From Swiss-Prot:
Gene that specifies this protein: cca
Positions of ATP binding: 19, 22, 102, 148, 151
UniProt-recorded name of the protein: CCA-adding enzyme
Positions bound to Mg(2+): 32, 34
InterPro entries per UniProt: CCA_bact (IPR012006), NT_sf (IPR043519), PolA_pol_head_dom (IPR002646), PolyA_RNA-bd (IPR032828), tRNA_CCA-adding_enzyme (IPR050124)
Keyword list, A-Z: ATP-binding, Magnesium, Metal-binding, Nucleotide-binding, Nucleotidyltransferase, RNA repair, RNA-binding, Transferase, tRNA processing
Protein species of origin: Bordetella pertussis (strain Tohama I / ATCC BAA-589 / NCTC 13251)
Family the entry assigns: Belongs to the tRNA nucleotidyltransferase/poly(A) polymerase family. Bacterial CCA-adding enzyme type 2 subfamily.
Domain of life, source organism: Bacteria
Amino acid sequence: MSRTDDPGVAGLRVYIVGGAVRDDLLGLPAGDRDWVVVGATPEDMARRGFIPVGGDFPVFLHPRTKEEYALARTERKSGRGYKGFTFYTGADVTLEQDLQRRDLTVNAIARTPQGELVDPLDGVADVRARVLRHVGEAFAEDPVRILRLGRFAARFGDFSIAPETMQLCRRMVEAGEADALVPERVWKEVSRGLMAQAPSRMLDVLARAGALARVMPELHDDTAVRAEIDRAAAAGLPLAGRYALLCRHTPERDALGRRLRAPVECMDQARLLPLAVDALAASATPAAQLDLIERCDALRKPERFDALLQAAAIVAPVDLSAWRARVQAVRAIDAGAIARQCAGDPARIKPALRQARLQALGGA
C-alpha cells in the first residue's frame, strides 16, 4: 500500500481509508483503494494533474493509477434523505473529522503510506471482535446506511451488529427516514447484498430494523426464502438467479421489480422461475418438456434458460445435463427445411415443426 515513491502525491498528506484497510485487517484480498487527502485544495490537486470526477464534493483520479483521492471533508444535515447534506472540504478539515462522518467504525480506519494505522474510533477493536457498530449519532442522518448495514452483515457472516446500532436503525425507520430512499439506491445496496456470502442476513437486518416493509413492501419474506437465497449464494448463482429466488414466493413480484427498478434480466428470471419449478416437476413427457422450453423461450435464449434451470435446482433436483441436451436437440431441428417440405401448405409448418421437435426430445 506504499505511496512513498509516488511523485504525484509527494508533499501531500494522504491516507488509505475505508474498505481497503478493513479488508486488509481481515486478511481478505485487496480491492480498490480509496484515498483521502488532508490539507489540500482543489487547485492543489489540479496543479498535480489529478482529474476531477466528484459531483457533490471534490474527488479526483490519480493521473497515472486512476485511484480515487477525495479531499477530507465534513458534512452537515441540511434536508431529508440521503441527498440532504452540505459538505465542507476546506484545507483545515482534519483526518479525524473526516473519519468521524463515516458510517461504521470498521470503515473509519485510515492507514498512512508507510503502513501506520490511524484509528481514533476504535475500529480495529471492532474488526477483531467482529462487530458492526455505528460511528456516532450522525449515522441517523443518512438512511442509506441502514441498507449498507444489511449489506455488510450479508458480506461478513461472522460479524454481529451492536445492539445500540440496531436500536438507532429502528428509530430512523420510525422517524420516516427510510421513506426518503430512492429506488436506485435501494437496488444498488440490495443487489450487492444478494451477491454476498449470506444474503439472508441482509433481510434479517432490514426486517429487524423495520425497513424491509418500507423499501420492499411487496416482498414475501420467510425462512424458505432466506434458505434458498443462501443456497444460491453457496452455489455461486449470478444476480438474476438470486433475485428470482428472493421473489419466488412473492405474488406481486412484477410490482416489486418495478419499485426497485430491477434490471430486465432479473425481472424476467423472477417471472419465469415459478413457472419453471412447477413445470420441471411435471416434465416427464416430451410434450411437457417442449412446452417448458418454448414458454421460457429457450431456443432463442439458451443461456437464460440454463441460468433459470440452475436457479430451479436450488429448489428441487434438476438434471442440468439432460435439459441442456434437450435444448440442443430441439435447436438442431432445421425449421427452414421443414418449411420447404411444406411448401404450398403453410398451415402444415407449425404442426410439422412441433412433431419434429417432439421426436428429437424422444431421443434426447
